[in-house]
């Protein structure tokens, strides 16, 4: 089987190491900026269709401003872009939109980033009625244009999760417009090319007061952003995982397949134990047979054997990752055979390569896996051949380094 080679036009060092091509720091004259006007911002898309859940399925869209006098934030925030890790660095603005029990969302607005007021009896605080999403914005190599990666997929996933959690959710169009406004309002926080990305965090919460167990009478949709670098402290170096035997992330019929807030608090115990032992994160097994791979705490898992790529199938206990979905499509366009199926822990231990995917990690090679005291290593302290090829193509698409034939990116110009 012939596979497409790594794109020769892409400098892989640009993807694997911070770029020095955009090193000039532009200093902000003031942080107390007035919100830019977004009344004229429209979403243009080549085609759309109304989905069964009432949202609009966008195949491609571009954000443009029809008012040339609108003032957008163009300078970069005055921070050390070379040391940006994956921690919160509050930007200027957040987006807030309310919804009452009838399911209709009011017009959202940009507010200065800050604390919110919430009732002690809010549904999200008492019963965990909340969802979140995560996506990224990248500054293109020219330093001007900004790209969003598949925001409509996050919108659809939030709507699916909201249905499971008995919550109303913004339409796909409302979601994408809100993300667009928020990113443009915080444009100066989008890192220079090669220095990281702007992490976008949409939240949907039951903020109405309840006492008995019931859906909240009011909901709040919030988006905030933060510039980020690599998720794992290892950066793009391989991570070390431990397979968890005692704790489980999800059960059949539960909420493992949606991005509800409770799924993540539940993994903190096992993750803390693993990190105390020197591991990067935890790989979970299914809770019934305890032999099939599920996922890592915050990302999906892939194995490679004889150039065949395998990943656990989506069946309700694994989050349908957008990076996972994108990686599968990229791999197939590169000529690889990809299987979505039950993957055993024994296959993991015999794999040629192992890697993780997720919005936060993008693609992270796995250097070792420890299972019942047995440690198996992969590669030689760097990306494997297959994972490096896929990483190069995917990140090149995300950063606008190659033509987006997949129609995945949204150009904010």
Curated annotation (Swiss-Prot):
EC number, as in UniProt: 2.6.1.42, 2.6.1.88
Please list the GO terms describing molecular function.
L-isoleucine-2-oxoglutarate transaminase activity; L-leucine-2-oxoglutarate transaminase activity; L-valine-2-oxoglutarate transaminase activity; methionine-oxo-acid transaminase activity
Describe how expression is induced or repressed.
Diurnally expressed.
A GO cellular-component term linked to this record:
chloroplast
Give the matching Gene3D superfamilies. Answer: 3.30.470.10, D-amino Acid Aminotransferase, subunit A, domain 2
SUPFAM superfamilies attached to this UniProt entry: D-aminoacid aminotransferase-like PLP-dependent enzymes
Its activity is regulated as follows: Inhibited by Ser- or Thr-derived imine.
Found, by tissue, as follows: Expressed in the phloem cells.
What reaction does this enzyme carry out catalytically? L-leucine + 2-oxoglutarate = 4-methyl-2-oxopentanoate + L-glutamate; L-isoleucine + 2-oxoglutarate = (S)-3-methyl-2-oxopentanoate + L-glutamate; L-valine + 2-oxoglutarate = 3-methyl-2-oxobutanoate + L-glutamate; a 2-oxocarboxylate + L-methionine = 4-methylsulfanyl-2-oxobutanoate + an L-alpha-amino acid
In which pathway does this enzyme or protein participate? Amino-acid biosynthesis; L-isoleucine biosynthesis; L-isoleucine from 2-oxobutanoate: step 4/4; Amino-acid biosynthesis; L-leucine biosynthesis; L-leucine from 3-methyl-2-oxobutanoate: step 4/4; Amino-acid biosynthesis; L-valine biosynthesis; L-valine from pyruvate: step 4/4
InterPro entries, A to Z: Aminotrans_IV (IPR001544), Aminotrans_IV_CS (IPR018300), Aminotransferase-like (IPR036038), B_amino_transII (IPR005786), BCAT-like_C (IPR043132), BCAT-like_N (IPR043131), BCAT_family (IPR033939)
Q: What class of enzyme is it?
A: transferase
Q: Where is the transit peptide?
A: 1-60
Knockout mutant characteristics = No effect on the levels of free amino acids in seeds, but reduced levels of Val, Ser and Thr in leaves. Increased levels of Met-derived glucosinolates in leaves.
Which Pfam families does its entry note? Aminotran_4
Could you share any additional remarks the record makes about this protein? Branched-chain amino acids are synthesized in chloroplasts, whereas the degradation takes place in mitochondria.
Q: What job does this protein perform?
A: Converts 2-oxo acids to branched-chain amino acids. Acts on leucine, isoleucine and valine. Also involved in methionine chain elongation cycle of aliphatic glucosinolate formation. Catalyzes the conversion of 5-methylthiopentyl-2-oxo and 6-methylthiohexyl-2-oxo acids to their respective Met derivatives, homomethionine and dihomo-methionine, respectively.
Family under the similarity heading: Belongs to the class-IV pyridoxal-phosphate-dependent aminotransferase family.
NCBIfam families given in the database record: ilvE_II, PRK13357.1
Protein's recorded name: Branched-chain-amino-acid aminotransferase 3, chloroplastic
| Source species | Arabidopsis thaliana (Mouse-ear cress)
């Amino acid at each position: 089987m012939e596979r497409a080679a790594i794109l020769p036009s892409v400098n892989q060092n640009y993807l694997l190491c911070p770029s020095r091509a955009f090193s000039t720091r532009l200093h902000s004259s003031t942080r107390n900026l007035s919100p830019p006007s977004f009344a004229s911002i429209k979403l243009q898309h080549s085609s759309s269709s109304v989905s069964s859940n009432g949202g609009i399925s966008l195949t491609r869209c571009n954000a443009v401003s029809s008012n040339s006098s609108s003032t957008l934030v163009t300078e970069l925030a005055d921070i050390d872009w070379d040391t940006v890790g994956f921690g919160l660095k509050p930007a200027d603005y957040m987006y807030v939109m309310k919804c009452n029990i009838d399911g209709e969302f009011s017009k959202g607005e940009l507010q200065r980033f800050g604390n919110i007021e919430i009732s002690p009896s809010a549904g999200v605080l008492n019963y965990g009625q909340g969802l979140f999403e995560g996506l990224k914005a990248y500054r293109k190599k020219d330093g001007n244009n900004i790209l969003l990666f598949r925001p409509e997929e996050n919108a659809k996933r939030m709507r699916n999760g909201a249905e499971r959690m008995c919550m109303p959710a913004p339409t796909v169009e409302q979601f994408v417009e809100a993300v667009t406004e928020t990113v443009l309002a915080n444009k100066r926080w989008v890192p220079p090319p090669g220095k990281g990305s702007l992490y976008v965090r949409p939240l949907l919460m039951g903020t109405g007061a309840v006492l008995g167990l019931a859906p909240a009478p009011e909901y709040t949709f919030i988006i905030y952003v933060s510039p980020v670098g690599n998720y794992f402290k290892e950066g793009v170096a391989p991570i070390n995982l431990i397979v968890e035997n005692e704790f489980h992330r999800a059960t059949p019929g539960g909420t493992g397949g949606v991005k509800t807030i409770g799924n993540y608090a539940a993994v903190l115990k096992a993750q803390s134990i693993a990190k105390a032992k020197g591991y990067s994160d935890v790989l979970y097994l299914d809770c019934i047979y305890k032999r099939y791979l599920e996922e890592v705490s915050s990302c999906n898992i892939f194995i490679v054997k004889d150039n065949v790529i395998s990943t656990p199938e989506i069946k309700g206990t694994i989050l349908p990752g957008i990076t996972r979905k994108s990686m599968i499509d990229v791999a197939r366009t590169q000529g690889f055979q990809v299987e979505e199926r039950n993957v055993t822990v024994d296959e993991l231990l015999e794999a040629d390569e192992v890697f993780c995917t997720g919005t936060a990690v993008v693609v992270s090679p796995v250097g070792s896996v420890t299972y019942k005291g047995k440690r198996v290593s992969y590669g030689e302290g760097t990306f494997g051949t297959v994972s490096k090829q896929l990483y190069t193509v995917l990140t090149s698409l995300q950063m606008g380094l190659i033509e987006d034939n997949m129609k995945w990116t949204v150009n904010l110009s």
